[in-house]
């Protein structure tokens, strides 16, 4: 099903009016798909990838040669110790320690250090392709637990995805999506999203892909053009940054 738009963040009780938004439901559905695919990719993704090391090294560029990572770590322990050493040094430099780059470096290096410790990788030779899947095949108990946790989250996301239907938010006569549905009054909004350049674009794409609405819905979405500095541009539904 769909989530309501407003909840009390203290007890998660629904707030009035009990309203279902077409845009927010479509966005949430898209996030679930992204989450599921991301979780699936984690299983065979490197535990410590070359890309992640390059990213955190980039955060140290303002430091020049003062704090930097080596290029030739032999073991995971060497990497973890160096990350700890650099993070500690950054914390002792007030001018840089409070910067976004320093905070991001300390946070990301902490994640890598925790993974190395949790998966008991310390004495292993550093391998940029070592994945959770590889560790599971070796019988690593922490990797087995992590894969099981990922599977549970993936199953939850899949269940939530399969439970969503956009048919109830679709105006069958106009072949367009309503703005939303007010459960409290059991009424639809009178207006519909009728332009391609609108916040509901993702909802339209996903609903068509799911088979909840006909492909003809796409043709019903208007595509008015205007000139901006002499160049043609789409006119959006309400002119917001969301579009």
Identify the role of each PLM range.
Residues 1-243:
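Acidic, mature catalytic/reactive cores of soluble proteins
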């Amino acid at each position: 099903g769909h989530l309501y738009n407003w909840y009390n963040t203290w007890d998660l009780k629904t707030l009035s009016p009990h309203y279902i938004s077409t845009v927010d439901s479509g966005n949430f559905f898209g996030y679930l798909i992204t989450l599921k695919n991301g979780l699936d990719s984690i299983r065979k993704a490197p535990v410590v990838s070359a890309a992640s090391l390059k990213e955190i090294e980039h955060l140290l560029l303002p430091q020049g040669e003062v704090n930097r990572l080596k290029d030739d770590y032999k073991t995971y322990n060497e990497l973890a110790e160096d990350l700890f050493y650099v993070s500690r040094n950054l914390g002792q430099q007030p001018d840089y320690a409070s910067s976004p780059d320093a905070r991001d470096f300390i946070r990301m290096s902490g994640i890598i250090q925790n993974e190395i410790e949790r998966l008991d990788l310390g004495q292993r030779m550093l391998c940029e392709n070592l994945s959770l899947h590889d560790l599971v095949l070796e019988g690593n108990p922490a990797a087995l637990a992590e894969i099981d946790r990922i599977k549970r989250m993936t199953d939850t996301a899949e269940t939530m995805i399969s439970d969503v239907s956009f048919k109830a938010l679709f105006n069958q006569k106009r072949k367009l999506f309503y703005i939303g549905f007010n459960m409290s009054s059991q009424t639809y909004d009178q207006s519909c999203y009728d332009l391609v350049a609108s916040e509901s674009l993702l909802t339209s794409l996903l609903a068509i892909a799911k088979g909840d609405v006909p492909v003809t819905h796409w043709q019903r979405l208007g595509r008015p053009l205007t000139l901006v500095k002499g160049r043609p541009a789409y006119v959006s539904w309400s002119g917001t940054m969301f579009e």
